[in-house]
Amino acid sequence: MNDWQWLKNRLVNSKTKSVSFWLPQTSSNIIDIAELIKCCSELKNTSINGLIDFLNQQDKLEFNLTRLKEIDVEDGKQLFGIETSVYKHFQNEIARFYKQVNKHFRETGSESLFLALPVIEGINEFNDIFRAPLLYVGVKLKVSPRFERFWLEINKEEIFLNPTIIGVETNKRNSLFKNNYDTTKIDVNDALKVFSELEYEFRMPLTSELKSFSKKAKSDFNTEKRTNYLINNVLLGIFDVKGDQLFQNFNEILNTDPDVLDELLKDRRDLLLENREFREQFDLKDTYLFSHLDIYQQYAVKQALLGDLIIEGPPGTGKSETIVNILVNLVLNNKKVLFVSEKVTALDVVYNRLGSFKHIALFNASVAAEKKRFYNQFAEFETYFTTYFSKKDLDATLPTFEGKWVDDILGAFQALQALYDTKINSGENLFSFKEIVSSFQMLDASYIKIKEYERFDEWVRVFSNPLWLEKHLSYQELKKELSQRWNGIDNFYQLQSLLNQTKKRKVLNYVLEHFEQFNTVISPKHVLFYKPSNKSQLLLKQLKQDVEQYTSLQRFQSPTKFETIKLNFINQVNENPTPWFFSWFIQFHAKPLLEKLVSFESNIIKTKQAYLNGIESYVASCKKLLKTTILNNFFQLYQTNKDELLEICRQAKNPVLKEITWWFKKHFELLKKLFPVHIMTLESAATLTPNQRGLYDYVVIDEASQVFLERAIPILFRADKYIIAGDTKQLKPANFFQSRAEYDVDEEFEDGNIEAAVHSSSLLHFLKNRSRILTLLKFHYRSDSADLIAFTNNRIYDNELIFMNKANADQRVFIVHDVIDGIWKNNRNLQEARDVVQRLEQLTTTNDYKKSLGVICFNKNQADLIEYLIDKQNNPLLNEWRERQNDVGEYEGLFVKNIENVQGDERDIIIFSLGYDRSVNSYGPISKQGGENRLNVAITRAKQRIELFKTNRGEDYNGLSSSSLGSKLLVEYLLYCEAMAKNQGEKITFQAVKRKETKAKYELAVENDFFNQLQAIFGGEFEIKRNVNEGAYFFSFVFYFNNIPYLAIDFNIPIPTSRKQVMEGILYREQFLKKRQWNLINIWIDEWKLNPIGVISKIRSSLAVHQNQHEEI
């Protein structure tokens, strides 16, 4: 058994740093309203007692700020410390605070807005100095259009006794303590009685008058006297006291079943799981698709079903879409799922992507703030059921996917490779068929007459003999001589025949003498009385010589062979026989092989398309099954729990909505059956669901790098298996039990308090090396331009990401604004902030106003300053831009944030306000440990463009030689932005990895020829580049028109040797290119050689289609 006490100790110690334990001063999230209550509220009795009585009896507390106009400057300075108009000050302050509350709600799903009173302060027995409100009353802030009035709607169902101070005390004592405070009313005396049970005593104020909240440091407390005080302060602010439910859950688990932490956090690594083998054997069996995922997303979904999985999702790699598919798979496998995140925006994205299938999930990010939305989900489900229900739809065939397509594609490629590798023997040489078909020239080889191509080299030897040629010419000369001598060649042939047939010399002499006299050849059988003459003797001798000579040359008489040898010499076949063999073989012997070649290549194309069509059909079938499951969930409950089901479905129509906690407690099992997926924040899950082991089959936690391990334990405890998604190279948790939006980042860094958070483990970091499986998403979709992600891919992700330009990406991706007279002073840069706001106003007059935009600062004060200047401008267009939502209600307005608060956000345009000038040696959070992760988050938010505002040249900033990785990368990134803005990106060395591929000489020769032909035919209209690296991919050729890629060509593509290569390197490479709007065609090397006209036609057609698409755009 492990000792997890350290975890508890860290949790408790961290709570002493939260604003519900130690509140030194007001902040942007907490304001003092004691004097406002006195000056401009409707309250008649403005004492603490009068306020409490009012809050217990009324539902709303109103404020009229116009009353502040009556306060002169001197009184304003005395009461509020304000030297300007008190009315204007608080009008602006309430406006700012109202926006801050709404901003917090957008990011967390909970307003966490409380009226907090009174404040207690002192020192506990463990020497922890505390100062925080005693009681918290949930309120909702409402304002008039011009912020002249505001009111607080009081939620009496959200009354809390400070849980943090009590929690720290009881945990440090290791004691069980029952908090018996009656949360139905506000009662200071009852609250103090609870504290007295823990031996806390407080010195009470002399009067009940409300007091202003003053700034205090821990050094102001007397640690020797240890006197505790109660002060009649009243604060309005964002307090995360509801998050203490997780704190309580954790303590319950640790106190009642400490051994369970060993089980929850044990090392589950599957040492027998061979990831390479998994990918090689991967198929979609038992896996459903809600959308056409890329292959790495499919890996993650399939592995998720095994449970205890970590999904590393770098920026823009489709993590949310992956989670959607995981949830659908779990539902279709009849599992109950809890899906949580610290960020409500992450929950919104996943829920909205379910679209019309959202009825598998119950969304409840906030326990108190979204009652109407909560109950509407049931009413909408009832409407969906009545609209689509029919009994025939309750049965659905389980969809199946033909995984053999991948095997078929691989088989076709392997067959093609085998065909390419087929050895062709010319007699003395072996050639591969690919070399022959790739290198052959169309030569006139029709004169080569051989049946067996294996005898070609022998034929070349025979028919390239110069001696034979000489002998043939001698034969021809001799034949002429014989024709002249014997008065015609036919006479010679007759005489030759007679000489060969007749052995009688006398007869031969007679014939020759007769030939001499009459010039004819006779064939006498007998010459009885003939006596040979000398003349005939000489003629016989001559004939014998001629016949002997003729016979010796007769085998060289063939005119066909003569012509063949002559052609061979003319064609220099003997000197270079290979091209002639290739051409002759292709024309007269390769027909069966060529037919196979065409068949294999055609089969690859058809099967690839069949696979893609099959995926689309499979997605449709899976959605049909999901619809059936949704209808069945409702139908089965309608049959078994009709009254209970209809009661909750009709709740949305009631004017007074019951508390969500009440419904969860009463109908929890029904809610799980009706909605197999529950989507909540961690706090909502802890508040609404029982702290019970195995409550769900799976828990899915998103953005887990920002979840502290302690906060996650109660959530992990509720499920049998976990699926954790996030990115260890993004932000770690900000502050225990407090969102990043709730604390002052700069102060935290200046105080050094953040170091504890930096060194602490997030859930993701802790479980990364303990989970059963770790999988990585690789395809990057967010950035339209590869340049936007290239830096972080190289510097942060070791070139693991797969990315490339969108075909229609803007050409101007980086804009650098050099700020004149910018100065870093008082932790901000005023001139730079002014320039940023001026730029925003300029963009409202351009087409960029239609886009989404965010401003990211490297310092909170700079962000606050820019927000202030925007507020001051009160530009209607900027105001509209700031409040913009998309079609499904997701916030996509103009934001201004520091780097700590932008994880999970994305915008078309990101504007950076660096703030710092060259005098700075430390860049705040960036220079601290983990600063590189903060930078990574910031520079990966843009989809289309980045604009950088800075005061000095990049090379003037300190940091390149810094020991801080964050500082070093920041300055490198400034230099990168400058280079890209000046179109000097080729000077940057950290681009995508280039493909290194060795090619045979004959392949290079064909490729050169192909390129030359492309240039000759298309070069006048298009810029054609060769060996192009686009992001993470390589292309043989790319056609550009006005710098827009119209067509990419893979020429002579490498043959895959595994299923993994087929899926990752071919099918989903091509699918990714389609999503990036690239037009790609494959040209086989043999296709070009065998049918160049057809290839050119194919290219023309592809260019025409893509040109039409661009014209439509």
Curated annotation (Swiss-Prot):
EC number(s) per entry: 3.6.4.-
CDD domains with a match to the protein in the record: SF1_C_Upf1 (cd18808)
Pfam families, per the entry: AAA_11, AAA_12, DUF4011
Gene3D superfamilies assigned: P-loop containing nucleotide triphosphate hydrolases
One MF term in the entry's GO annotations: helicase activity
SUPFAM superfamilies named in the record: P-loop containing nucleoside triphosphate hydrolases
UniProt: ATP binding residues: 313-320
Keywords: ATP-binding, Helicase, Hydrolase, Nucleotide-binding
Record-linked PANTHER family: DNA2/NAM7 HELICASE FAMILY
Family: Belongs to the DNA2/NAM7 helicase family.
Protein's name according to its UniProt entry: Uncharacterized ATP-dependent helicase MG140
